[in-house]
Amino acid sequence: MTGWRSRDEGFAVRLGRLALWAGMTLFGLVGPVMASPADRLVPAPLEATLSGERTPGRDRFVVYPPSRSGPVMKASVARFETRMKKAFALGDAGRAISVRIDCACAPGSGFGLGEDEGYAVSITRSRVRIRATTEVGVMRALATLFQLAQRDEAGLSWPLGDIRDEPRFAWRGLMIDVARHFQPIDALQRQIDAMELTKLNVLHLHLSDSEAFRVESRLYPRLHEVGSFGQFYSQADIRRLVDYARERGVRIIPEFDLPGHSLAMIYAYPMLASAPVPDPPWSLPVRRNAVIDPTREEVYALLDDLIGEMTALFPDPHFHTGADEVNGIEWSASAPIAAFMKQKGFETPEDLQAYFSGRMHGIVSRHGKTMIGWDEILAPDLPKDVLVQSWTSSKMTGLAARAGHKVIVSAGYYLDWLTPSSFLHTRDPLDLTAQGLTPEGFDRVRGSPLERLISERFVIDPTLRMTPEEEGRILGGEAAMWTELVTPEKLDATIWPRAAAVADRLWSRPEATLVPLDERLEAVSEHLESAGLRHVASPQAMQGRLTPEGGKVVATLLEALEPVKFYAHNHESRSGGRAPLQSFADLADALPPESLPARRFNRQVAEYLAGDRSLADVLRDRLTRWRDNDASFQALLARNPALKDAASASSDLARLSEAALEALGRLQDRSLRAGRRDARIDELVRTHLAHQAASADAIASFIRPQPPGDVLLAPFDGLRALIEAGG
């Protein structure tokens, strides 16, 4: 389905962009020979001049921090030393490279919004030197050095040269929804470690929703005793997590979603309700419709107390109050609320929400915080100091900035959509057409069941522009990790390494490097794994439980599969709440959102078709493995019923690989005449084009039939390109 500008612009554009990169490589503009080690960094630095030589190989390194280092600086150096020793198997004896840090850093410097995070690194044959003006700047430099380090038979080394770096945007965040699925403290700590390594600096915790309220409240204990359903963070947990993040240059922003998405709070304290709520389990419509009553003063008294208690736990000056997806059904059905609206002269539920937002702004401000809200909070009378977080479309970024608000961009950065890193990376915060529904697409939604979920705010306005002053109000962005389908075991792999693509977009200048993103992410993925992230290990463990036998055979197939995209695997949302509960342990759940090996194959096909015939053997080996794997995989099915959802994917991969091998042979030897292509292959191509189309955008993912097992053939673009090129 067309009409939603999202995943990509189609097969021709995807292959064309890859071919363009390939052509640039062939003609010497970029490529393995000329690319600097800095070109493979994530995020890419502002300026880097590296010679191609490296420091002499050594057995170890020694860091010399500033003489007046505070506890944060000392902890940063200690983490760097630990990570380096673990990643490169370094000891404490032998010849050493010296790493000297020059920083007259005040304790706590660089943590605030807009404070200096810049640094410079100079690497000579005799030493590495870091210069920064803040403690956080030193952390960013150490993250860069960790990625640049290399160990071979000669020993540990770094590339010679100079780097000067600073972020493009001040706000570079990751939002994690801990309400839908509770995420343990150690899981959040792993994400903070990864954020430090990729230079993200804001962890936004979505702490309450209709499913649960997740923080201990001593003033209103039923919120966590009843509303958490047994899983919550104690106040001591929160304080430890805030300290843990601060040591790593990460600020934590709390979000308590109000007035909608509040069923758990209402269930704990029914006096908050606009309408009575049933006992759980709650259907999807009940969760969507529940909303706090904004007309009663006792509601604001409770919220004032609660916000005062919560702001004391989170020292950051920002406090998020949610404000998204308030449908107003309960307000419209309530006679007392209707009378209140008439008294105040409010004509719509949006007017009442604007009133609530104004009251919340007063409460948050009295507690010394700056309020943040999702873009539904935008209203003519909204105080200008409220930060707006755009999510419905890129248009809302421009409208909020035009209205005088500072903006955090999440439109297009939804990790739960399971879109590839290239999708995330191409969404620029300043591009007001980057994400959203086209006007034509909006017309197609009218009259469908989706119409009640879609409004004009989701629609792109191609005429909208920002002035330089308005662009200056864009603080940055946040990758958003909503967890309806994400258990703690799935958290790392659903976020990483794709979140590094968002980190790169928010830190680096556009087109800062021409080294392919998938190649850069493969490298950073290894660094994240060595630092303790479980984005590789957890999917492997889940796959192992699905089938305890078949190791290499199963792995060969699964590297070619990805889960369907957007909302296609969310059976509850697709069915309007009528689908049975999901297990979160099916084959699609055990797959990472993106197969980097398959994406690499697609890129290599584009490079080959652009003229790099040296890749023929690499492609032939991969295609042969995929073709020959199917017989062994089909033999496993009788003993491993959990794999049945992948049966057709395996056979289709084998057939397409065979056709691609034949095409590759003809491309290599033009004397081989192309015969008439098997009609069954053409039909197979059409089938998988339909599978792709069903995941092409959010709207399609709701309404189109999905492939068996909710899985896609990730190398399909490359397979199709070879088949078509070979005649």
For every predicted segment, state its role.
Residues 112-320, 334, 359, 363, ...:
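Feature activates predominantly on carbohydrate-active enzymes
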Residues 1-14:
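N-terminal secretory signal peptides that target proteins for export/translocation
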Residues 86, 200, 250, 369, ...:
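Short glycine/serine/threonine/alanine-rich loop segments
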Residues 41-44, 48-51, 55-59, 66, ...:
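Substrate-binding groove of N-acetylhexosamine-processing glycoside hydrolases
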Residues 33-170, 371-374, 378, 382, ...:
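Acidic, contiguous N-terminal accessory segments
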Residues 103-107, 258-260, 324-329, 377-379:
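Short, internal active-site loops enriched in acidic
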Residues 19-29:
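Bacterial N-terminal signal peptides
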Residues 324-339, 343-346:
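N-terminal leader/propeptide and maturation segments of large enzyme subunits in energy/redox metabolism
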